[in-house]
Amino acid sequence: MEDLAKFLFGVSGNVIALFLFLSPVPTFWRIIRRKSTEDFSGVPYNMTLINCLLSAWYGLPFVSPNNILVSTINGAGAVIETAYVVVFLVFASTHKTRLRTLGLAAAVASVFAAVALVSLLALHGQHRKLLCGVAATVCSICMYASPLSIMRLVIKTKSVEYMPFLMSLAVFLCGTSWFIYGLLGRDPFVTIPNGCGSFLGAVQLVLYAIYRNNKGAGGGSGGKQAGDDDVEMAEGRNNKVADGGAADDDSTAGGKAGTEV
């Protein structure tokens, strides 16, 4: 019964995480249509890519037995994020943006290759699992912490305009599903980061409940409603906030953070 419950929560986590991975599609359709990345940042997609690669590697049977569902969704996520990065490279608005994205992609490939090679050639058994698990967990926690800038923006503007309800709910449900999956599998490398994700998702929902009647109250956003642009903010766009300043560069909302396991 415990194995069945673990499997069901893993499948649930896969479905919700896939929704989160695909949430930036409207943003990239806009980039392709306009043939420019405009003021979007490619950093969140590179960061999500390294997290997906490390998590997918960790879930492989020769690293962490009985965690194949971790590999399936993160493998799919790695393919999707790679496509996003390629779009950024092709349609970069400036040469500097293209070089920066290419440099980050090279760093991602180097870090993943280093972890994979060391774990394969120098480590075995629990030592291999420990290295890969720690690497994946550190990246996951960093990704889950990224919505803090969006939450700060919500508190500052007293508006949930940049934090769509469905995205926040999906982050909470995804983090919770993988948290329970990790508990049932007694795997701290799945439980710890996703426990953080579930908690931050819950905080986002609380903030939404507090400020839900203040959509568009931030002023300088031109009355923009939840929709593609909200998702774009969630994916790291350098959006302008009410006081005329820029939101934190390269920030990501729960949409991406919520996919890491």
From Swiss-Prot:
The chain crosses the membrane at residues 7-27, 43-63, 72-92, 102-122, 130-150, 165-185, 190-210. The lineage of its organism: Eukaryota, Viridiplantae, Streptophyta, Embryophyta, Tracheophyta. It is a multi-pass membrane protein. One of its GO terms (cellular component) is plasma membrane. The keyword Cell membrane applies. Disruption phenotype: Reduced contents of sucrose, glucose, fructose, starch and galactose. Carbon starvation in leaves at filling stage. Decreased chlorophyll levels, damage to the chloroplast structure, increased reactive oxygen species (ROS) accumulation in leaves, leading to leaf cell death and premature senescence phenotype at filling stage. InterPro entries: SWEET, SWEET_rpt. Residues 28-42, 93-101, 151-164, 211-261 are cytoplasmic. Pfam families: MtN3_slv. Keywords: Cell membrane, Membrane, Repeat, Sugar transport, Transmembrane, Transmembrane helix, Transport. Forms homodimers. Residues 1-6, 64-71, 123-129, 186-189 are extracellular. One of its GO terms (molecular function) is sugar transmembrane transporter activity. Residues 7-95, 133-215 form the MtN3/slv domain. Highly expressed in leaves. Expressed at very low levels in roots, stems and panicles. The gene is SWEET1B. It is found in: Cell membrane. Mediates transport of sugars across the plasma membrane. Can transport glucose and galactose, but not fructose, mannose and sucrose. Belongs to the SWEET sugar transporter family. GO terms for biological process: carbohydrate transport. Residues 218-261 are annotated as: Disordered. It catalyses: D-glucose(out) = D-glucose(in); D-galactose(in) = D-galactose(out). This is Bidirectional sugar transporter SWEET1b.
